[in-house]
């Protein structure tokens, strides 16, 4: 990283301050990255479990496939999905709190006996599918945040901190060289003045 530097004490102090900020911030960002990595892993596992549960529910649904031709699908519909927001390692993610279903009244005497079980099965199926979608959305947000945090860690570790250290080293060398030149020029001037005094005397 090419850092624009001025070879003076003010620039030196500013660069030291910026370096300290990055060195102090790096462990915090690393902790956030590891927390996000763990959360992504947990979220992937949760998504896989929900996928498996959804497959089992679909298989149970397909087992009664012949009966579903009689079922009135307009009896049940999703009325509302209640959302929440949760912060995970500083990242706001959606949280499924509840799913409200609207069940139209039907005649218990005229409808087949298994309708109640069918409605229950459809509720479970819909709830699991909605929960899976929320988990996948959460996973996407967490993975994006983890990638950004990893990029920031790499930027600090591999580019900015070494860049600032290099710039500080250059400024310090320049200032030391300038000081040495100043001292040596003073010595030369002093020795020339002494030679003149000796020549005059």
Where are the predicted features?
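Charge-rich amphipathic alpha-helical interaction elements
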Residues: 1-201
């Amino acid at each position: 990283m090419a850092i624009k530097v001025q070879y003076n004490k003010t620039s030196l102090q500013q660069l030291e301050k910026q370096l300290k900020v990055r060195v102090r911030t790096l462990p915090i960002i690393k902790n956030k990255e590891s927390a996000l990595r763990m959360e992504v892993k947990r979220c992937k596992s949760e998504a896989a479990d929900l996928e498996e549960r959804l497959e089992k529910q679909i298989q149970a649904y397909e087992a009664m496939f012949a009966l579903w031709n009689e079922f009135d699908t307009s009896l049940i519909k999703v009325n509302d999905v209640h959302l929440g927001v949760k912060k995970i390692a500083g990242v706001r993610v959606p949280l499924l709190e509840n799913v409200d279903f609207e069940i139209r009244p039907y005649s218990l005497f005229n409808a087949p006996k298994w309708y109640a079980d069918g409605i229950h099965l459809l509720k479970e199926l819909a709830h699991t599918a909605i929960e899976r979608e929320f988990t996948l959305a959460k996973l996407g947000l967490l993975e994006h945040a983890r990638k950004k945090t990893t990029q920031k860690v790499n930027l600090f570790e591999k580019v900015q901190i070494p860049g600032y250290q290099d710039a500080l080293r250059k400024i310090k060398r320049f200032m030391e060289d300038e000081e040495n030149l100043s001292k040596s020029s003073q010595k030369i001037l002093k020795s020339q003045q002494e030679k003149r005094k000796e020549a005059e005397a």
